[in-house]
Amino acid sequence: MKLQKPKGTQDILPGDAAKWQYVESVARDTFSQYNYGEIRTPMFEHYEVISRSVGDTTDIVTKEMYDFYDKGDRHITLRPEGTAPVVRSYVENKLFAPEVQKPVKLYYIGSMFRYERPQAGRLREFHQIGVECFGAANPATDVETIAMAYHLFEKLGIKDVTLHLNSLGSPESRAAYRQALIDYLTPMRDQLSKDSQRRLDENPLRVLDSKEKEDKLAVEKAPSILDYLDEESQAHFEAVKDMLEALDIPYVIDTNMVRGLDYYNHTIFEFITSVEGSDLTICAGGRYDSLVGYFGGPETPGFGFGLGLERLLMIIEKQGITLPIETEMDVYLAVLGDGANSKALELVQAIRRQGFTAERDYLGRKIKAQFKSADTFKAKLVMTLGESEVEAGKAVIKNNRSRQELEVSFEDMMTNFENISEQLLS
């Protein structure tokens, strides 16, 4: 058997990993500005944590979860999304306690797992950035969280981003709409895809979310959920729209958007961008005011979003955005002869401990090959260290671009490399 990575997974090599680290760093910095703290939850959860919260009839649970029984006969699943594990942790760790400052603002970055057909920007192991805010029913929370995602996209330079907005209302208004949708779709049941015929019985709102051509045709003239909002739901949605306008965040109303998870109420949203003529969802989320109670905690409002890192990086690449990744090395040591081996290690370590990036040759290559490595690493400074330099206790350091040189003692290198660097690079 040829040993290779499983289907739908990837190896992220150093050149690409630098881009991942940059995007993750910008996300962390942005979320910190909004007073969010990082949470890390297990990669696997008890099956019920996901099935009961995400919804037994969703595609995630019925088709896409990686689940198994462990050696203790416990039903376990690899997490397919981030919200349910964070809510479970919020309840289990009693973050609802009065002494904990509200709202509780959390973000996470990590792997998720879904068994689905691998395609561009969508893998079986994928990486998600997500945020969850607990304890505030204020529509300003909805808008602040949406604005935070918008702020992140601005920082990354992503263009042509459109906010799509809808409201699912309260449980009561959603139930009234559910019945209206059943009444509308039942006469055309035979025209729906097989999946949507099942959804009509189990979760009719999901028919609106279908990507199948026949389903899209069927729901074109479906009733709008906004016509079924009760007074409280309408007021919440109007406040969200007003505050988005106050922040100059443009939006479009999309009444067919329902989101693929069962726990949402009131505001739901997606950010969509255009890549090579196709619309791609870059980020999605919404409000979920009953989920904490569902996990055995006190009734607690919640709002959050998730975005896929693979898709985000694909969009960055397709839009021709150059990420400002530091690729230059401060100094490269070319090493000649066994007599210089130990001193080279000593010097390169001392330079690194002063905060500089440094590399040396370990392979005993010819000097030309070592200088080529220095160029490949984009080294600003190059030093050649042979047995004669070791005997003298000093060596020449050269600016790799201007060719300016400076003879420096080992003692100065090991204690004051910053001054040497400034002299050669200024």
Curated annotation (Swiss-Prot):
Entry similarity comment: Belongs to the class-II aminoacyl-tRNA synthetase family.
Protein name, entry field: Histidine--tRNA ligase
Q: Which CDD domains match?
A: HisRS-like_core, HisRS_anticodon
> What is any one of the record's Gene Ontology cellular component terms?
cytoplasm
Its BP terms in the Gene Ontology are:
histidyl-tRNA aminoacylation
EC code(s) of this entry: 6.1.1.21
> Does this entry carry the keyword RNA-binding?
no
Q: Name one GO molecular function term.
A: ATP binding
The first-level EC class reads ligase
Q: Where in the cell is it found?
A: Cytoplasm
What UniProt keywords apply to this chain's record, in alphabetical order?
Answer: Aminoacyl-tRNA synthetase, ATP-binding, Cytoplasm, Ligase, Nucleotide-binding, Protein biosynthesis
Tell me the name of the encoding gene.
Answer: hisS
The reactions it catalyses are:
tRNA(His) + L-histidine + ATP = L-histidyl-tRNA(His) + AMP + diphosphate + H(+)
Where mainly located? cytoplasm
According to the record's subunit comment, the protein's assembly and interactions are: Homodimer.
